[in-house]
């Protein structure tokens, strides 16, 4: 938005709405920490539940997969991708009051503003929860002291890849996350493809490896699609539908 006055006006409107919503609508968060290890391109959490991941096939090496940032089972930390921080994983989800999606239906502009703010609130809840996990619950960054601008440019250790985003593009992985932490506890319901309702919801993983970074899977080949369908235990054509944007 190039016009500073328009930007300021929208900010003022958003802040006024947030003040009106105080006590009426809420953001919710849920997380759990699990012992975990990698098995090829799968993340295996305690109890044996697997989270199949995808690996980059385009561009230059290294061809990354999120499982790279967890230690293989029974392997000591000897490589650059294996440290004492790489045997635990966080699984999380955040959402907002479902009423935010319906209370403003009569006013298209207010509905648009409500949806934009609801999305930001769900993301902000995830950011705040991730900070608390790093510093207190997981505790691998007890001495972290970052300003909000520093947090927004991710100067902290670890990553928080979300389902449906470039490094974890398959939204149907939400079914696995639901099995692990029961996201229904915070009011989230899943569609048949794994999309979340309310729309302003976020789910994903927390990885603490000091070299963990965000990346985009990009396009994958038929060979990886076949392997992924096998690891998911799902029909090939269903996985093809889930990963259409990556084929």
Give names to the regions the model predicted.
Residues 2-13, 109-117, 125, 165, ...:
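Catalytic cores of large soluble enzymes that bind and process phosphate-bearing ligands
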Residues 95, 102-137, 214-215:
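Conserved mixed alpha/beta catalytic, RNA-binding, or beta-rich assembly cores of soluble enzyme
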Residues 1-112, 116, 146:
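Active-site loops and adjacent core secondary-structure elements that bind or stabilize anionic groups
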